[in-house]
Amino acid sequence: MQRKLARENAFILIFESVCKKDETAEEIFEKATEVRGLEYDDYVKTVFFGSYENSTKIEETMEKHLKGWKKSRISPCAMAILRLACYEIMFMADIPSKVTINEAIELAKKYDDEKSYSFVNGVLNSIALEFAE
């Protein structure tokens, strides 16, 4: 599976976890893969379950970099993109931050409103600088 497709499928799973807070990660994953046939590989599983298990740490990091934004104002789509990208930046050092940010921008352009990608870009650049130190 190409990384771009894997990242998009991980985003779909994370988006569902943002929207379906009453379901466990395992339930979301099972429904998406077995019922709807969402393709996955090791990357998809690692990012989805890793972002779910580390959601508190990821959210704390994101909140430090929101600069004038309240979490409640962020669309579920942008929140899922930020969680995915934050997980990559924070826990997957083998993926360059620039690649993560560019792919997150592409997801925002495809799935969210026209202004979302610049917001996503700004937040992720700030987070990447923190983790580059």
Q: PLM features: what roles do these ranges have?
A:
Residues 1-117, 121-133:
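N-terminal interaction/assembly modules
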